[in-house]
Design a protein with these regions (language model features):
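Motif I (Walker A/P-loop) of helicase-class P-loop NTPases
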Residues: 53-62
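Conserved P-loop NTPase catalytic core
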Residues: 116, 144-150, 154, 162-272, ...
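Conserved pre-motif I regulatory segment
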Residues: 7-46
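Short helix/loop capping segments that flank catalytic or ligand/cofactor-binding pockets
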Residues: 54, 83-84, 128-130, 157-158, ...
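Pre-Walker A (Motif I) flank of P-loop NTPase domains
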Residues: 38-45, 70-71, 115-117, 277-281
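Conserved Walker A/P-loop ATP-binding site and its immediately adjacent core
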Residues: 56, 69-94, 287
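Subunit-assembly interface segments of extracellular/virion macromolecular structures
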Residues: 45, 62, 66-78, 82, ...
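Conserved RecA-like ASCE ATPase "motif II neighborhood" in helicase/translocase motors
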Residues: 101-149, 157-177
């Protein structure tokens, strides 16, 4: 298991190494059970929000490369920064692979499949169509099995026009990419799987199997933040604070927001004293984007 062992050695986290080893084995066993190399199969890879799903995806890719799979697509949402971030992380994690970005079509055609190849693409109609044509036309792809890992698989991938008897652009292109290979395993990766589970059997998007990623030690998720009794770190503000902001000019900062910013600055100072640098503060005031402009810095 050269590829998986090399990937694990770069994680520098014993509990994550154990988790990735176990999860990738479970995914491998499910593929062996549900995939017959004649018809495509769909798997749901379900993990908690911000619980290390990317690390698990890369571990699964490494394990499948060890048994001879050669072509992997890793799909991100249609966001330039996210695609680049995923590409750079994959490149630094899978050093034994040929990791390609969206514009590396010439490199792909020149280098072929001497190494296992991961292509990191945005879910963008133009980009997906371009790579579908490349996969269809290249000689060394013929007869190869394709593995697709769709990060946030419930975002943009499904057919949003099904009730109008039409095909949405992204969904149509993804179907075409799946059909370009002799057969395909498609992994829908998400923390919010409801829409995927509700897909019809005939759609081709209903999962044949499900794998759940357990979060590692120290993970703080819904069980912590929505616990009863309320955890110490949760503070409730007045329910009408947003009304106060929208009624005043852009310089008005309500009491709850002021306190939140002060807590954040204290935490930043604490982390700096410990030699840590990464601090983020997020405000989600409304589902309406025009309200967000009042909070933008």
């Amino acid at each position: 298991s050269m590829y998986l062992d090399n990937y694990l050695s770069r994680l520098n986290n014993e509990s994550l190494e154990t988790s990735v080893t176990e999860v990738s084995k479970q995914i491998f066993d499910n593929v062996k059970k549900f995939y017959n190399f004649k018809e495509s199969a769909t798997g749901l890879l379900f993990g908690n929000v911000q619980s290390g799903k990317t690390a698990q995806m890369l571990g699964a890719i490494a394990r499948f490369a060890d048994v001879g799979y050669k072509i992997f697509l890793l799909l991100t949402s249609d966001n330039v920064d996210l695609q680049r971030q995923t590409y750079l992380r994959t490149q630094s994690s899978l050093l034994d692979f040929n990791v390609l970005s969206e514009k590396d079509d010439i490199k792909f055609l020149q280098e072929g499949l001497r190494k296992p190849t991961v292509i990191v693409l945005k879910k963008n109609g133009r980009i997906l169509k371009k790579w579908r044509e490349i996969l269809l036309s290249c000689q060394f792809c013929k007869g190869q099995f394709l593995m697709i890992f769709d990060d946030e698989g419930d975002n943009a991938s499904l057919n949003t026009l099904v009730n109008k008897n039409r095909h949405s652009t992204i969904n149509k292109n993804l179907d075409a990419i799946k059909d370009s290979a002799s057969s395909c395993v498609y992994f829908e990766v998400t923390a919010t799987p409801q829409s995927l589970i509700l897909q019809s059997e005939v759609s081709g998007w209903h999962p044949n199997f499900v794998n759940y990623f357990k979060p590692g030690k120290g993970y703080l998720g819904g069980d912590f933040f929505y616990a009863d009794p309320k955890p110490f770190c949760i503070k409730y503000t007045k329910e009408n604070e947003l009304d106060d902001v929208t009624a005043e000019d852009d310089n008005y900062c309500p009491e709850g927001l002021q306190e939140s910013i002060l807590y954040f600055l204290i935490e930043c100072a604490h982390k700096k004293l410990k030699g840590e640098t990464n601090c983020n503060f997020m405000i989600h005031p409304s589902i309406k984007t025009e309200i967000h402009s009042k909070f933008a810095i």
